[in-house]
Regions:
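Alpha-helical structural elements
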Residues: 2, 29, 33, 72, ...
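Acidic, serine/threonine-rich low-complexity disordered tracts
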Residues: 15-120, 162-268
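Active-site/ligand-binding surface loops and adjacent short beta/alpha elements
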Residues: 120-177
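Bacterial N-terminal signal peptides
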Residues: 1-9
C-alpha cells in the first residue's frame, strides 16, 4: 500500500555507466495520474492514486525542471493505513541531473523527511533527514557525476535509447537512496502490445526493475513496466509482486504530453 514505491522502489546493485541522455520525452505541463490496486488471492482492490507533474522553476537564478510526485490512499482505507507521500526534484532541463530533492512521506503514522542539495561542482550531496521518534541529522555524501534521486531516475528511464539494446540487456544507473549511493539496473525485455482500460491498445517498450527485498517488495526482477513506444515514453502499466499479494498501477489520465501519441494502435 505504499503507493509511490510502486513507481519509486528500492532497487539493488548493478554496474555504473555514463549518463549521456538528453531529455526529449517530457516537458513542463505534463501531468500523469495512476490508480494503484492491491491483490490478495483473487481479489483486486483500488487503494490509492499517484500523480506526477512537470513544470518550470527557478533555483539559484537558474532554470530548472520541477518534478513532483504524490501518492494518496483513498479515504476508505485511511483508518487502516493512511498514505500521504510527496517527492520533489529540481533537475537540469536537458540532462535531468538533480540539483535538489525533497521527500516528505507519511505512511501508517510513520513520517520521513529527507532533503538533498546536490553540489555538482564538488560531487557531494548535503543531506538533512528526520524520522518519527528520531531527531534531525545531517550528512555529507560523496556522489558520482551520474547520480540521480529516486524521482528523477523515473524520468531518466523514459529517455533511454532502447533501440541500442537487445532483449535481456541490462541498463545500469546510480541513485541516492536513503542517504546511500546505490548502483541499479533495468533489464530491457523487448516490445509488446497491451490494452489499457479507457485508452485503447498501444505498442509498448517493456522492461523490468531489479528490486531489493525489504519491507514491501520481494527481491528479484519481478516488477514489470510498460511504456509507450513513441517519443513520450509514458508509463502505462506496472505489475509487481510484494511480500503479501501483489500490486499494479494503470494510467487513468495523461495531459500536456510533449509529442503525439503515435504508439496507440486503436482506441478500443
Amino acid at each position: 500500500m505504499i503507493l509511490l514505491q510502486v513507481f519509486l522502489p528500492e532497487i539493488t546493485s548493478g554496474q555504473n555507466e555514463k549518463c549521456n541522455i538528453i531529455n526529449f520525452a517530457s516537458a513542463p505541463g505534463e501531468s500523469l495520474s495512476y490508480i494503484v490496486s492491491y491483490n490478495v488471492f483473487i481479489f483486486w482492490t483500488d487503494v490509492g492514486v499517484v500523480n506526477f507533474t512537470v513544470s518550470e522553476a527557478e533555483k539559484d537564478k537558474l532554470k530548472r525542471l520541477y518534478l513532483h510526485g504524490t501518492g494518496l490512499s483513498f479515504p476508505i482505507w485511511n483508518w487502516f493505513f493512511k498514505v500521504k507521500d510527496s517527492y520533489e526534484s529540481w533537475t537540469d532541463p536537458v540532462t535531468l541531473k538533480p540539483y535538489e530533492f525533497k521527500r516528505d512521506v507519511y505512511e501508517g503514522g510513520y513520517k520521513i523527511d529527507i532533503h538533498y542539495i546536490f553540489d555538482r561542482g564538488r560531487n557531494i550531496v548535503c543531506s538533512t533527514s528526520s524520522k518519527t521518534n528520531k531527531p534531525e541529522w545531517k550528512d555529507t555524501i560523496k556522489i558520482t557525476e551520474c547520480t540521480y534521486d529516486v524521482l528523477s531516475i523515473l524520468y531518466y528511464t523514459r529517455n533511454i535509447d532502447y533501440s541500442a539494446y537487445n532483449p535481456g540487456d541490462t541498463i545500469p544507473v546510480t541513485i541516492l537512496l536513503d542517504n546511500e549511493l546505490t548502483n541499479i539496473y533495468f533489464r530491457y525485455l523487448g516490445k509488446e502490445n497491451i490494452r489499457v482500460h479507457g485508452f485503447g491498445k498501444f505498442r509498448c517498450i517493456k522492461f523490468s526493475v531489479y528490486l531489493v527485498e525489504g519491507t514491501l517488495f520481494e527481491g528479484g526482477e519481478d516488477m514489470e513496466i510498460w511504456v509507450t513506444d513513441d517519443d513520450n515514453r509514458i508509463p502505462l502499466k506496472i505489475n509487481s509482486p510484494i511480500l503479501v499479494g501483489s500490486v499494479k498501477a494503470r494510467i487513468i489520465s495523461m495531459k500536456g504530453i510533449k509529442h503525439r501519441l503515435n504508439s496507440r494502435i486503436s482506441k478500443k
